[in-house]
């Protein structure tokens, strides 16, 4: 979402979308899955 693809910038907000951005009534999404170690 910062406009320059994948990079090492720690401030990069990722690839999240807001609710409705991908179609009416679609929930917000993020491809990152959290894992507890």
UniProtKB/Swiss-Prot annotation:
Belongs to the peptidase S8 family. GO terms for cellular component: extracellular region. Its EC number is 3.4.21.-. One of its GO terms (biological process) is proteolysis. It is found in: Secreted. Residues 28-37 have a biased composition (Polar residues). Residues 1-14 have a biased composition (Basic and acidic residues). Heterodimer of a large and a small chain. Keywords: Hydrolase, Protease, Secreted, Serine protease. Residues 1-37 are annotated as: Disordered. It comes from Achromobacter lyticus. This is Protease 2 large chain. GO terms for molecular function: serine-type peptidase activity. It comes from the Bacteria.
């Amino acid at each position: 979402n910062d406009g320059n693809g994948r990079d090492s910038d720690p401030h990069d907000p990722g690839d999240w979308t807001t609710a409705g951005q991908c179609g009416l009534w679609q929930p917000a999404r993020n491809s990152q899955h959290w894992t507890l170690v």
